[in-house]
Amino acid sequence: MIALLACMLAVAPAGSQPSQQPVGPAPAPAVVPPVAAAPTPGTPALTAADLGAWLDGNLPAALLQGKIAGVQVVVVKDGQVLVKKGYGYADVAGKKTMDVDRTLMRIGSTSKLFTWTAVLQLVEAGKIDLNADINRYLDFRITPKSGRPITMNDLMTHRAGFEEGLKDLLATDPARLKTTEAYLKENQRPQLFPAGAVPAYSNYGAALAGYIVERVSGEPFAAYVEHHILTPLQMPRTTFVQPLPRALAASMSKGYHQSNMAPGPFELVETAPAGSASTTGGDMANFMIALLQDGRFGNGQILRPETARLTRSPVIQPQPGFAAMAHGFFNERRNGKLVVGHGGDTIVFHTDMNLLPEQGVGFFVSFNSRGENDAAYGARQRLFDLFMDRYFPAPPAVTPAAIANAADHAGAIAGHYEGSRRVETGFISLFYLIQQDAITANEDGTISVSSIEDKKFREIAPNLWREVDGPRQLLVTETGGRRTIIDSANPISVMQAVPAVRNSTLNMLVGGLSVLVLLATALLWPVAAWLRRTYPGRAVVTGRAARLQFLTRLSAVGDLAYLGGWYMILAPILQSRVEVYNAGLDGWIRALQIAAIIPLAGAVIGVWNAGTTFATGRGWTARVRSVIVAAALIGIVWVAWMGALIGFDLNY
């Protein structure tokens, strides 16, 4: 269990919260063609020469320090490619350099932008109603929670309420790759929340949208995207087809955990419309230009201008200035500028695409390695932050003074929170049980959030907390009777206060202490036997008490073996081996689910043994020991139950 507890990973970001139901979007304002603004004194002009030199000064060092094999970066401006560059290797062993126009990258969830574009095309064609029950378009039924139908708007804003899922998310064996239809029908995700109520990012929901595109268009999803988006935008080296077509396969970049390691296999994304695109930086330049030009690229038009502007028109915004989802596109403010886009991650590829519509600028970056200590995540974030600070700097941040009773409010909201993007069904729930956000009230009346490092927040208005010397904000509200924290930087998840029984500190303490007690019990068992043989005059327990003592010790060993089995199931997550979670693992998981009889029986035996120890009048040392062991056996059942290790669900 010590090893099992070490598996607990941070898996659910904090996020954002609705203040209303998603109805029809407000009309987007007309976009004035971008006009180059005069740079702030001391701010370099965004030119090809300056940007190219700046990238040359930053990216090679980032690759070397982070053990990242290669990266592509493309910046467009005013309808033209400003800079496109490749650094490092697409194939380290083969010394194949990164070619922005030919080398394909896996862009993960950035693929969703093509899915949402396809949906908007079919809205234009009158084939999809954003506010209709999606069951209208499906050949299987999703029973809505609380009777509130799921709409396409809900899917596009990640407010369908689906819980997260891991099973069949990725594969490496083409023989195991399911169609989107099969995946959706066999892996239907439960709803944690009624549709429209709470944001919870969902690959399942995005895959549903792609399947609806197939259903209403009459074309396979990959073919639809090729015919209606990629071809008009002259993107011949982009595809959703998996495995890659032979004509493109030779140009696919290798994917690495670290540049000094062997490459991993090609990652097959089972929720294809949610993340299976392979593309080049050169092709993505065309996509960015089209979005910045209201759907137009050259002589092609993939969306009407008024429809394209919906990607900059949030359906729901919980608070002015907060990030929001606009028909599948992230909308946020960076340095006071509107930024529209989407990031994307597979296990080894890490991508981001950001558009500044008001400046006519697009920024695309894709790394082919996770890097040492997940360096690609930080490198990706820092690169765009530095780009914005260099070319579009923010005015000095001024944090308003705190309101009078901020310190009292800080104490009231301090505690543990779980993300709305989580799993409650199946054994993966254990991760979300143990890893939670902690909000701490500081002595100066500010609060700190464990997942937002090195930042403090000051209450500047009732229930509104702002980063000290920064723009980030937190809004305190309530949904479904639970205190909820909305992060201005995250529109796809919220933090929800946990009840005492789900408190991660409590459960870690119960689990950790229980394991230590059971380990001691198991290890001391042979010691006790040796003492009996060595000192035969010692008092010996006999009869039923002896049998119960034996069974209690056996239960301790059985519980440790049971937890060891679950560790073997959960350990691949530590190595990012998500592809192992498929039907091939069902037999082992079912065996462990049946084996839950071991800790359940052990808890009963432990209590029985403690009761017998007291009833037979044994000494206080034996009594205390029996109670501690019984509590430990009960503790294992507690954590197993709270972490959904006890149950028979194979959909996780």
Per-segment meaning from a language model:
Residues 1-6:
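Sec-dependent signal peptide recognition
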Residues 7-47:
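Compositionally biased, proline/threonine/alanine/serine-rich low-complexity intrinsically disordered stretches
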Residues 84-92, 144-357, 378, 383:
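Short, surface-exposed loop or secondary-structure junction motifs
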Residues 342, 352-369, 483-488:
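Short, well-ordered beta-strand elements
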Residues 377-652:
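Peripheral terminal and inter-domain segments
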